Amino acid sequence: MIEVRKEIRIAGFGGQGVILAGIVLGKAASLYDGLYAVQTQSYGPEARGGASRAEVVISDHEIDYPKVQSPDILVAMSHQALLTYMDDLKRGGALIVDPDMVVEAEIEDFIRAREVKYFRAPATRTAEERVGITIVANMVMIGALTEATGIVSVRAAEEAIKDSVPPGTEEKNLMAFQAGRELIMEGSR
């Protein structure tokens, strides 16, 4: 049997919930989809506004090397994150960006040259308009990621969200997740 290993990098800045998004993705894969998953994170010393990155490796076999080297999927929630990490993305990989937070004109050549599957998910705006709070933009991105790539099942993602977010916020986070899925279903490419 061929081993399937997928590497995902979610990046943005502190305060966007990047780390929680990585935790949700890892839990969805390992606890609810029955796969192996490793999640790592890094962030700058700033409480808010500094660089933030979550990485998840998902496999159907035990994971012997937990670091993401060349992600199959990059989720960029800020322009700086996009510029910092886009060159690592595998040829033909999936790139999901918040178009309100990045300068898309700067990456058009990259997308063509690398044959990237490109998805636009205006997570911050969608969180504000559909849920009423921007803090759930990370779950909008998890919804977009789930719908665009199928990396985890919808059910697993929903269970992981309920298991990971602060008590009392489950409904808003699930609304944000669904809104993110709908962005992809509606062709926000």
Swiss-Prot record:
NCBIfam families linked? PorC_KorC, PRK08537.1
GO molecular function ontology, one term from the record? 2-oxoglutarate synthase activity
List the InterPro entries. 2-oxoglutarate_synth_KorC, PorC_KorC, Pyrv/ketoisovalerate_OxRed_cat, Pyrv_flavodox_OxRed_cen
Q: What name does UniProt use for this protein?
A: 2-oxoglutarate synthase subunit KorC
What's the Enzyme Commission number for this chain?
Answer: 1.2.7.3
Q: State the encoding gene.
A: korC
What organism does the record attribute this protein to?
A: Methanothermobacter thermautotrophicus (strain ATCC 29096 / DSM 1053 / JCM 10044 / NBRC 100330 / Delta H) (Methanobacterium thermoautotrophicum)
Q: Does the keyword Lipid biosynthesis apply?
A: no
Provide the top EC class.
oxidoreductase
Question: Is Electron transport tagged as a keyword?
Answer: no
Q: Which keywords annotate this record?
A: Oxidoreductase
Q: How is this protein organized at the quaternary level?
A: Heterotetramer of the KorA, KorB, KorC and KorD subunits.
Q: Which reaction does it catalyse?
A: 2 oxidized [2Fe-2S]-[ferredoxin] + 2-oxoglutarate + CoA = succinyl-CoA + 2 reduced [2Fe-2S]-[ferredoxin] + CO2 + H(+)
